[in-house]
């Protein structure tokens, strides 16, 4: 049946053309954006996952920047510590030279003073972005410095930022800006041999041997004793069987000295019936040293110089340990930086598998749709021409 009111063939061809046009728009959008899931309407589940992971990847990018900043801080501190170690080695060399008979110690002291000034200069200059890890205010205890290490999303979806911590304490900073507890400004107390102490408890005597030691001094009331020897308020203390006993040299004329404390806290010193016999503890064996920053060898005897060299060597040991810690932190930051880079690439790859368009497939499909569109246009043209043929019947 041929109708001039309803052209069914033209309607069918037009519907086909509309469908092809819609498919072409979708395919062209995939080709132009490179995404087969560009919005939630395309695939809500994949779009949601991709959006979340892209957000996490942006956070990882910030972590990468923070790791770079942290690496710069650590590298600066390490370089400063390494330079300071070389200077302290030179100071130790000067002290060894000063033990030679007939040496002008005043001249050597002048050289040491210059080296001490260099240590101060290194410590003050080892700063990056306002952060200085070689000197700190330790009056309130250790100070923790942190470097952002990673961004984590757990199984429940909760997010957190993990950090790499580094403690600025008496064994890691060169100078305490308020007190005297840094490696270079604290006093190292050194003994050159073991000391045999006779302890009398209510008339019962027993002997105890305290081995050679190199330990820190106490700087404030209430601080805890550390190690086997400490200096507080001008008094020397030794730790025997977990009891702190105050000792004096034979030069004081005292045959004994009352006990110090029954606990490890300096603020709880009490009188007791303990007595230490110092007859076997000559002055050379229980000696107070100097800080590296306060070294003054003018007029110093051979025994004191030997003890001072041991103290400087103890400071070098602490500095070497601190440099090793900084090196370990630097290595960890480098490893974490590499991991974050790889993790970011993995996330990009995973998101791509979910939402990226296959350009080979899309280009092939676009070519096919263009051919279909041309055929649909031709079909519509043929269908429209059928109505024109009706006019020939009336000629």
From Swiss-Prot:
Annotated compartments: Secreted; Bacterial flagellum
A molecular function GO annotation: structural molecule activity
UniProt cross-references to SUPFAM superfamilies, sorted A to Z: Phase 1 flagellin
Keywords: Bacterial flagellum, Secreted
Transmembrane segment boundaries: none
Domain of life according to the entry: Bacteria
Secreted is among the record's keywords: yes
UniProt GO cellular component terms: bacterial-type flagellum; extracellular region
PANTHER family tied to this protein: FLAGELLIN
Family listed: Belongs to the bacterial flagellin family.
Purpose: Flagellin is the subunit protein which polymerizes to form the filaments of bacterial flagella.
Protein name: Flagellin B
Organism: Rhizobium meliloti
Lineage of producing organism: Bacteria, Pseudomonadati, Pseudomonadota, Alphaproteobacteria, Hyphomicrobiales
